[in-house]
Curated annotation (Swiss-Prot):
It comes from Caldanaerobacter subterraneus subsp. tengcongensis (strain DSM 15242 / JCM 11007 / NBRC 100824 / MB4). Disulfide bonds: none annotated. This is Large ribosomal subunit protein uL18. Belongs to the universal ribosomal protein uL18 family. NCBIfam families: L18_bact.
Length: 121
């Protein structure tokens, strides 16, 4: 019997493959994206220390009332918020880690909003 692997299992395999190549340093930390069925999360991570430097999501008090669901509008708001917080901490250059997701839709919208708000990647 052939069992088709779930989409999430395939995404995790892709993410592991990408993580072998994408590494965040103190000079250029990693901007990681995760999306659940209801929310979108973004973190800027220094992989040498294993610390999260900045984070933003649709669960943040600033976005909770404005951003409803994991859609493009919410992704745009999360991208702008993570860029604003990163620039406040002096982080301008990052490495984008799409988390195994296709660079399309919500992930692309978040990345474009972060770029427009001042992050370089």
């Amino acid at each position: 019997m052939i069992i088709k692997p779930s989409r999430n299992e395939l995404r995790k395999k892709r993410h592991l493959r990408v993580r072998k190549k994408v590494f965040g340093t103190p000079e250029r930390p990693r901007l990681n994206v995760y999306k659940s069925l209801k929310h979108i999360y973004a973190q800027i991570i220094d992989d040498t220390k294993g610390h999260t430097l900045v984070s933003a999501s649709t669960l943040d008090p600033e976005l909770r009332d404005v951003a409803k669901g994991a859609n493009k509008q919410s992704a745009k708001l999360v991208g702008e918020l993570i860029a604003k917080r990163a620039l406040e901490k002096g982080i301008k250059d990052v490495v984008f880690d799409r988390g195994g997701y296709l660079y399309h839709g919500v992930v692309k919208e978040l990345a474009d909003a972060a770029r427009q708000a001042g992050l370089n990647f």
